[in-house]
Each structure stands twice: as structure tokens, then as C-alpha cells.
Amino acid sequence: MAEAARHPDDMKTPDELYRYLVDRVAGMESQNQELKEQIRQLESDKRYIETQKIRYEREVRKLKSEIEHLKTPPLIVGTITDIIDSGRVVVRSSAGPRFLVRVSQAVNPTTLKAGVRCTLNQQSLAIVEVLPSTYDSQVYGMELVDAPTETYEDIGGLEKQIMEIREAVELPMTRPDLFEKIGINPPKGVLLYGPPGTGKTLLAKAVAHETHAIFLHTVGSELVQKYIGEGARLVRELFDLAKEKAPSIVFIDEIDAIGASRTEAMTSGDREVQRTLMQLLAAMDGFEPRGDVKIIGATNRIDILDAALLRPGRFDRIIEIPLPDTEGRYSILKVHTRCMNLSEDVDLMEVARLTEGRNGAELNAICMEAGMFAIRKEHPQVDQEDFLTALNKFRCDFERDHRLTTAGVMFA
């Protein structure tokens, strides 16, 4: 190092000067390399800092935008009642009065329709946004998430009724060209009536399964609400949802809860039921006969239904679901026992003859009780004796026709 620090003038020989210069060049190259590494490190730090700066600037803009949104005054919710032209519409605000307002350029003119909800600016009442349609939570609850799995093979003894309901509901949805070729309008709705437990609901679910349609199931009593207009609104939203989800089937079970004959109402509750019925009649009149929405009603009391509900144009086809005869009961027993492990001595025809006046639900209960007796005896199969024992218990312990109970009653 001492030699390298000497001045070039002190060098006495060319060799010493050469070594001195070589050492100086090597030192300068090493120093140059270190400076290059420092420059690369500084450039890398600069790029990182610039990236962080861009990220923080973006975050600042996002927070400023959120603050501006929070400072924005709330909008008024209104309903479009009439469309004057693409830039002006008549709206009814949530407070009640109507206004002729302008439409923001950000709103798509094709979304402007009468009855659609929208948001209005507080100052100018201009339409800022068109809101999506919404329905009551009860209406959404009427839609079955899982499609019905029941098929026509699960129904026994109703071959004629199956044919009639397929003609009235299934064919218009799957083969509308047949009706167009003949030149007739298919039935708008089908009413199923008959004693309890004869398979009315099962038949409606089977139709929905075969047509691959959305199944909207409700009970008439669910449409009866406490406050004025609530029941009519539920009916209106139910049929609007059915049109939106088309092809769909609206099934109203126990329709006599809202469809009873109108009389001089003595209470506000009776008047509200009549308002709901009138909304139902208006909704049924609004359907296209060849549309993808069908309505099926079911009742045990057709004798008390209002005549306006039964007239052609609403429930065009009225199908009776009677108590099964011997052949029908035999078919029902075959359906209920197809998954049971039966012994060879089981005679379902004899069981069918012994169950005169029983409906499908009661026959299912008899099959279940026969299986329970086999389990009690720890038998691997259900024999004829189990069926006869179940039939005797069903007949003796619970007299359904007279509603009499005795000790050891069986509730099937």
C-alpha cells in the first residue's frame, strides 16, 4: 500500500511506473463497480418508492371517492307512472305527489317502463337510477328451490285425471304449436277438487316435474293479510314473479281460504279477503292463454267457491279427484309398496278390497303400519298378516269419518 501511494515522479524505473499504473487502474475499476452497484440499488429503491407512491395515490383517490359518496345526500325512491318521451317521465314519489321530471343521460331509456321503481335527486327530482324489481320475502318463499321429484309413476289410480291435466297444463307449455294448428286457446287454469288425501298436491308437483317449470306453491291462507291491500299486493307480486320465472306453474292449495263466495262483509277482515279475491280474479284474467304461466288450484270445498272464480276463462278445466275405487287402490298400494320387502303371500288386491272408502294418504299409512309390525316381530319381510293387522288397527283405533278416538289411537 505504501508503494501504491507513491507519486509517479518518484518512480525510478519503468517497471515500477507500470506496476503503479496497473494498481491504480484495478483500484479505479473496483471503485467503478461499487458505484454501479450503488446506482442499481438506488434505481431499484426509486422504482419501489414510485410504485408505493402510485398505490398510495390510488388508495387516497378511493378514500376520497368513498368520502364523497358518504357526503352525498340520500335519493328519493319513486315509481314511474307514465312515459312522455325518452327524456321526460311522470313519477310518483314515496311521499305521494306526482311530478314530471327529467331523465339523467346515464339512465338507459329502454329500462324506463311504467311501474318500475327509480331513484330521484332531492333537488331537481331527476331520475338518477332505475332500481331492479323486488318482491316480498313471502313471495320468494313460495318458490321451491329444488324442483319437484314426483312423477306420474308415483300416482296411482288417477289415469283419467292425469290425462286431463296433461292436456290442460303440460301440452300448452311443451307443444304450443298443436293448439296453434287447431286454432284454439288452451285452458288458462285447472282446479282440482276432491276429498283430502286423494293426491291433488302430488298431481300438481308431477306436472311441474314433467314440464321442467318453476313451481310456485302457496296456500290460500298465506294470501290473507292483516293490513288493507297487503293480500292483494302479495297476489300481484306472486303472478309478476311467475311471469319473470316463466315457464312456471302457480299452485294455490286450499284456494277456498280466499275464494269463498262473496257475501255482504260484516268485518274489515272479510272485506280484505274479498279484495284479495278480486286481485286474484284480475291476475288470472291478465294471463295469455298460450303463455308459459299456468295456475293450478286445489280445494276440498268446491261448493263454497265464488262463481266468478269457476267461470270459463279463469279455471277453464275443473277436474274431480275422487276417492279411488278397488283398481285405483290396488295401483296406489303398488306405488307405496314398490320399495318394501314383501313376502310371496302378500295379496295387494285383497288389501285393496278391504280398504273401501280409503284415500291414498290412508293407504300409505296402512303400508307404513304393516312395515312397523314386521319390524316389531323382527321379520325380514312384510307378510299378509302384517297388512291385515295394520288394517284392523287403522279401522278400530281411529274412526276418521266420525272423529272418534279410543285407547291406543294411531295417528297416521
From Swiss-Prot:
Protein name as annotated: Proteasome-activating nucleotidase
Superkingdom field: Archaea
Subcellular location: Cytoplasm
Chain positions covered by the region annotation Docks into pockets in the proteasome alpha-ring to cause gate opening: 410-412
Subunit structure: Homohexamer. The hexameric complex has a two-ring architecture resembling a top hat that caps the 20S proteasome core at one or both ends. Upon ATP-binding, the C-terminus of PAN interacts with the alpha-rings of the proteasome core by binding to the intersubunit pockets.
Coiled-coil region(s): 18-72
Gene3D superfamilies, per the entry: 1.10.8.60, Nucleic acid-binding proteins (2.40.50.140), P-loop containing nucleotide triphosphate hydrolases (3.40.50.300)
Keywords from the named record: ATP-binding, Chaperone, Coiled coil, Cytoplasm, Nucleotide-binding, Proteasome
Organism: Methanospirillum hungatei JF-1 (strain ATCC 27890 / DSM 864 / NBRC 100397 / JF-1)
